[in-house]
């Protein structure tokens, strides 16, 4: 397995798809990285030479990916929560922050339904 940015890239996949295993790299960015590195994106990862892998590592290194990106996203959310702005409050409460309705739906953010407790007599 090829190792790029601390992630093992699956050997059986095409280079374009394999690079998407790295957090922060999607299909579009993956293809642009392959073009910039001069590597055929339809080539399987197992068929890449060491020189190709080194070029890919160099191109991926130009972007914020994996741990650094995760840390940046977490810090952005923490900043919103510390500011106390609407989005931060919604993050803190675990509710949707982009204007979706919550009277019904929003189960992904709110979690599973709590069972209604029976009334005591």
UniProtKB/Swiss-Prot annotation:
Subunit and partners: Part of the 30S ribosomal subunit. Forms a loose heterodimer with protein S19. Forms two bridges to the 50S subunit in the 70S ribosome.
Protein task: Located at the top of the head of the 30S subunit, it contacts several helices of the 16S rRNA. In the 70S ribosome it contacts the 23S rRNA (bridge B1a) and protein L5 of the 50S subunit (bridge B1b), connecting the 2 subunits; these bridges are implicated in subunit movement. Contacts the tRNAs in the A and P-sites.
An example molecular function term from Gene Ontology annotations: tRNA binding
Domain of life: Bacteria
Protein name: Small ribosomal subunit protein uS13
Gene3D superfamilies: 1.10.8.50, 30s ribosomal protein s13, domain 2 (4.10.910.10)
GO CC term, one of those recorded: small ribosomal subunit
Region annotation (Disordered) ranges: 92-121
Biological processes annotated in GO: translation
Family: Belongs to the universal ribosomal protein uS13 family.
Native organism: Burkholderia multivorans (strain ATCC 17616 / 249)
A Pfam match: Ribosomal_S13
Record's keyword terms, sorted: Ribonucleoprotein, Ribosomal protein, RNA-binding, rRNA-binding, tRNA-binding
